[in-house]
Amino acid sequence: MVASSYVRSRLFIFPSCLSAICLGIAPVQAMTFDLGNPDFRLDWDTTVKYTGGVRLHERDHRLADSPNRDEGDYRVDRGDMIMNRADVLTQIDLTYQQIHGVRLSAAGWYDFGFDRNVEQNPELRSQGWQSSYENDRYSGLVQRYYKGPSGEILDAFAFGSMEVGDTPVNLRFGQHTVYWGTSVYDHYSNSIAYGQSPLDARKSAMVPGSTAQEVFLPVPQFSLQSQVTPELSLAGVYQLDWKPTRFSEGGTYFAGTDYLFAGPDRRPLSPGVSIPRLDPLEPDHKYGSFGLSASWTPEFLDGELAAYYRRFDDPMPWLAPQSVKGGYRLVYPEDIDLFGLSLNRSLGDASLGVELSMRHDAPLNALGVSIADNEGPRGDTLHMLVNMIGALPKTSLYSSGTWTAELSYSRLLDVTAHEELYRGEDDGCAPLGLDADDGCSTRDFVGATLQVTPQWLQVLPGVNLALPTNVRYGIHGNGATSASGQEDTYTLSIGLQADIHERVTTALTYVTTYAPYSRVTNGVATSGRDGFSTRDRDWIAFSIQTSF
């Protein structure tokens, strides 16, 4: 039995693409220990990485002059370091006859240059505007995850295999990750795997090349997979706990809104006046999310056709906080149903993945959350994606290379609850005079991601070079669900990577994001497509890592 905490072979493509940087990772050089018994094996893998980042873009004062967006923008000046960070990831596998075993992995980090003091626009401070943090110092949560030194346990699970009659059943119990479907990039918005695991978006933004093991946060759960016949396999998962997705915290460099999410202490409303952030409203029972899947691999198909059903509590909140007596808080939706189909097969020399899914009572893009029932807008939505992975055509310009393309589509079928709170251009936005240019959702959304990575082998003895280039673009419309993509927004990254003797990987990567703003009042941008408040945060990252 393979001890991997992932269940789709195509997953190898996107660990680094979580942050749209898409750097490759050198093969891990594992240490294997002789335990004196051939039935037992102990493998220990450790990766150490350094990342330095520098801001390249001047502040756009139409953004930095906003009292709710200035702290992230004033975090560093152009030419200053965003981070000066060391990370370590270590993993131990103890197996018995390569069938049963346990896995334990952990991550640690420290940023040598992180300043605990919150920066504000000096003009706003002089007017009496408070920062989003008490005493103008980052909270303990922010200091733990951004400064350190700190760490956490990731995987901690046991695995094994047994036979029920003549049918083999593979089991895993403990803290691990399960990921279904064929998505490569659009895993957190339009895929079958949406909400199946919380994500560490903080780390994916801060650390280029973060692996899936670091970014997909494992949760305590029980999962199984059984090969019922040579052509049919069944799988199931039951979660024993719930964890929220981690976002870039307000007031840090990659955050667009100062008073969100779990880090800030308060929300400034006017000079000298702020309201406190309250504890989030999380699911009543942090257990019970489950899923079932069946995979069929008939010979004539030359691939895999799979069906899925999941019922889950969302690790992502409605992104508009709820205003309640005494403060504001985030609210996490419960009881979402997802039905899906996927196809994974070869098509010529390329690999093809297709997904079609429908969500019932899915949380929608919100203007707010009702205080009557602690619910935001919900609806039924349709999602589809198609992706292909292949090798670049042979040419004298490079030695080899790969390309990956993914097209995503979503459609709002119906608003089933709190239509007045739905941030749709014909719904809650209409009375406010807002439209799609202000980030209001449309019925349909189309987006695409393309990555091209040419490689040059043995440019020096033992040295291979690669030039990963990745662009993600919103082609049409604004998605109806949270963070599902918006028209005319993009993320572009261009990197130069060197793999040295398959032991050391270095990379230099430029990253830029763009979203248009639509309204400027008194010199301050007040509205636009989602992501407009970080459009002036271009940066360049240098990283070096080794594994042993």
Which role fits each region the language model picked out?
Residues 30-44, 57-59, 93-102, 115, ...:
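Short loop/turn motifs that connect adjacent beta-strands in outer-membrane beta-barrel proteins
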Residues 40, 70-72, 80-88, 149-154, ...:
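Residues that define the transmembrane beta-barrel architecture of outer-membrane proteins
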Residues 42-50, 100-106, 169-173, 233-236, ...:
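Transmembrane beta-strands of outer-membrane beta-barrel proteins
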Residues 46, 86-94, 104, 155-160, ...:
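Residues on the lipid-exposed face of transmembrane beta-strands in outer-membrane beta-barrel proteins
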Residues 206-392, 409, 430-439, 474-475, ...:
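Signature for the C-terminal beta-barrel architecture of outer-membrane proteins
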